[in-house]
Structure formats: structure tokens, C-alpha cells
Amino acid sequence: MKISHIPPRLATGAFILNTGIGKLHPEEDAAKRVHDMAARTYPFVAKADPQAFVKALGAGEIVVGSVLLAPVVPAWLAGAVLTGFSGGLLAMYFNTPEMTKDDGVRPTPKGVPLAKDVWMLGAGLGLFLDGLGDRRRKRQRRKARLYT
């Protein structure tokens, strides 16, 4: 792991892990709010029990946070996981009308909590792209050794 990967992996991993742990024992009204918001963007979620959905979401967040914090996970994979996770959150943001102003991009006060997750998308893409570059450089070095 590169030293430059530690700050984004630590910041996002700890944040997501903590959020996931907090969802393992949700209160009924909080579970319903999270479930309803997710169901507006992802209609198949409406069929799930709110409590079970939020617990499963929490477990998923724990996995994502753990992947980011585990130094043995390559940067490209950690970045791909974070990009997918944050992409799902931003999809909820963009598909929930009361989250954005009339232009569909800038957040309303209700949208700020999800709009801020764009930083995780940036961190995920950065890790992913840097990790892919590392893989390419390793292959090129290996190939160069074979032909010298």
C-alpha cells in the first residue's frame, strides 16, 4: 500500500464502518426513513422489511469500511468498492427531488447530507485509477525483466 493511499482509505473506511455499526440496531422510525428514501430510488427495496433492510445496509457498510481499512486489499479493488458504494448514495441524491434545487444538481438543505458523499466518489476513483496504474507498471517491469 502506498503511503498516499492511507489518508483516503482511513478517512472513508472509518467513517463508513462507524455508520454501518450504527445501523445494526436501528430504531423503528429511523429504519423506516432510511428504507423509504432508498425505496424511492430503488423500487425493489420497497418489498423489504425496513428493519431488515437497514440491518443489511449496515452489514454492507461494515464490509465496505473493512475493505478500505484492510491494507492487504489492493488499491484498485478498494477504490472500486468505494466508487460503487458512493455511486449508490449519489444515485439516491439525484433521484430524490427534494434533495436538489430546480437545476437537479445543487443540494437543498435536505440534500446536503447525501451531496457531501461526492468526496467519497472522488476518493474511490482516485484509489481505483492509481491502483490500475500500479498494476500496469508492475506488468511492464515484469515484461522488461523477461526480455533483458
Kindly label every feature range from the protein language model:
Residues 1-63, 70-148:
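Membrane-interface extramembranous regions
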